[in-house]
């Protein structure tokens, strides 16, 4: 099973809480995290894109770096780990993304890929005059289909004459082309999103579900496999989890309870309000799960809380789910979390038994 780190491009990572670690996103922080991840043989690092935050006492995600420029910098200071940036496709023409991706491919030596997102939070785009209207919710994957076709043309042949409803290319050129096949990833959980990933993505991200229920996402992975089978392609699921680990189950649980007690209700209210704006998509979209009050303090990603041995066991359960090819991990404290994962959790995982024993990173 592949292991990736979802780097904290926004302030405070993925905990909407006054009692969680409070920090700003910086290049130096993310460099330290990704270099540690590479040292411990993580397979990939991904950054999201967020253009407006949730506010509240913690000013959650009000402070964000930009994904492509961050990952270009990280590509230059790493040598093995795969690097993915996220394109907010309403803000960037596909020909520009194709050229930026080709540039980072050159920086990284063929280790770069692109995560495509359609956009769900209207204020991110409306503040720049780029929101196309609420009808976009129901046609966003039509838009993304044209977008990825332009990308594939330009990366594959260096030229595009694509003509569609949203994009018109007139002998558009991009050169040099990438040195390695450019992987495209997506995070669709709606039927339309999965159909898109089945046809165009190399793999699909999905949310884990619940607290210490590592296999609860299995129906989502099964839906993705069913959609991919219809296209004759192999598109695996990579599952998002937060790891909160400590020496004992009790110590880890105490941290989790403390984070929940400090939930930033004002920021969470913003998330709930924005999630209700999309009345066109189905109930199975990512944003619906993010705003569920069950575990909104960490956006309802699957959460693994326990001792190092308990977390290792639960991750092995994830690996056993049909269609699960990898996990994307967040941590309550990223620097400590990546290190303890590499030294205390990964060596106990049967699905990572092929990874050699790794000594502590030398500063």
From Swiss-Prot:
Its EC number is 1.14.99.46. InterPro entries: Luciferase-like_dom, Luciferase-like_sf, Pyrimidine_monooxygenase_RutA, SsuD_RutA_monooxygenase. It catalyses: uracil + FMNH2 + NADH + O2 = (Z)-3-ureidoacrylate + FMN + NAD(+) + H2O + H(+); thymine + FMNH2 + NADH + O2 = (Z)-2-methylureidoacrylate + FMN + NAD(+) + H2O + H(+). The gene is rutA. It comes from Enterobacter cloacae subsp. cloacae (strain ATCC 13047 / DSM 30054 / NBRC 13535 / NCTC 10005 / WDCM 00083 / NCDC 279-56). HAMAP family: RutA. Keywords: Flavoprotein, FMN, Monooxygenase, NADP, Oxidoreductase. FMN binds at residues 49-50, 115, 124, 140-141, 190. One of its GO terms (molecular function) is alkanesulfonate monooxygenase activity. Belongs to the NtaA/SnaA/DszA monooxygenase family. RutA subfamily. One of its GO terms (biological process) is alkanesulfonate catabolic process. The FMN-N(5)-oxide reacts spontaneously with NADH to produce FMN. Requires the flavin reductase RutF to regenerate FMN in vivo. Signal peptide: none annotated. PANTHER family: ALKANESULFONATE MONOOXYGENASE (PTHR42847), ALKANESULFONATE MONOOXYGENASE-RELATED (PTHR42847:SF4). This is Pyrimidine monooxygenase RutA.
């Amino acid at each position: 099973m592949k292991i990736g780190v979802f780097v904290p491009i926004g302030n405070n990572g993925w905990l909407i809480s006054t009692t969680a670690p409070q920090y700003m996103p910086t290049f130096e922080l993310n460099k330290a995290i990704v270099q540690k991840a590479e040292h411990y043989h993580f397979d990939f690092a991904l950054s999201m894109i967020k253009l407006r935050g949730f506010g509240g006492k913690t000013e959650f995600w009000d402070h964000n770096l930009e994904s492509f420029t961050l990952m270009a910098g990280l590509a230059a200071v790493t040598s093995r780990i795969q690097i993915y940036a996220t394109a907010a496709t309403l803000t960037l023409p596909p020909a520009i993304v194709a050229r930026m991706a080709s540039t980072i491919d050159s920086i990284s030596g063929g280790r770069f890929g692109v995560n495509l997102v359609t956009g769900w939070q209207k204020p991110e785009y409306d503040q720049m005059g780029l929101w196309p209207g609420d009808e976009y919710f129901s046609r966003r994957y039509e838009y993304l289909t044209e977008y990825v076709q332009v990308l594939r043309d330009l990366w594959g042949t260096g030229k595009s004459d694509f003509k569609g409803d949203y994009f018109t290319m007139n002998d558009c050129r991009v050169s040099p082309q990438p040195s390695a096949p450019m992987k495209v990833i997506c995070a669709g959980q709606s039927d339309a999103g999965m159909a898109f990933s089945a046809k165009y993505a190399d793999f699909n991200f999905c949310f884990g579900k619940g607290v210490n229920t590592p296999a609860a996402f299995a129906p989502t992975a099964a839906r993705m496999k069913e959609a991919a089978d219809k296209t004759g392609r192999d598109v695996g699921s990579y599952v998002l989890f937060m790891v909160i680990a400590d020496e004992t189950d009790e110590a880890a649980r105490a941290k989790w309870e403390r984070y929940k007690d400090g939930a930033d209700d004002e920021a969470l209210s913003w998330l709930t309000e924005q999630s209700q704006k999309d009345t066109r998509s189905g109930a199975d979209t990512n944003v619906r799960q993010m705003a569920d009050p069950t575990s909104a303090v960490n956006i309802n990603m699957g959460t693994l809380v326990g001792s190092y041995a308990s977390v290792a066991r639960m991750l092995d359960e994830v690996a056993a789910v049909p269609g699960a090819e990898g996990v994307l991990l967040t941590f309550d404290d990223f620097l400590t979390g990546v290190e303890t994962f590499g030294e205390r959790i990964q060596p106990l995982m049967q699905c990572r038994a092929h990874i050699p024993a790794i000594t502590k990173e030398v500063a």
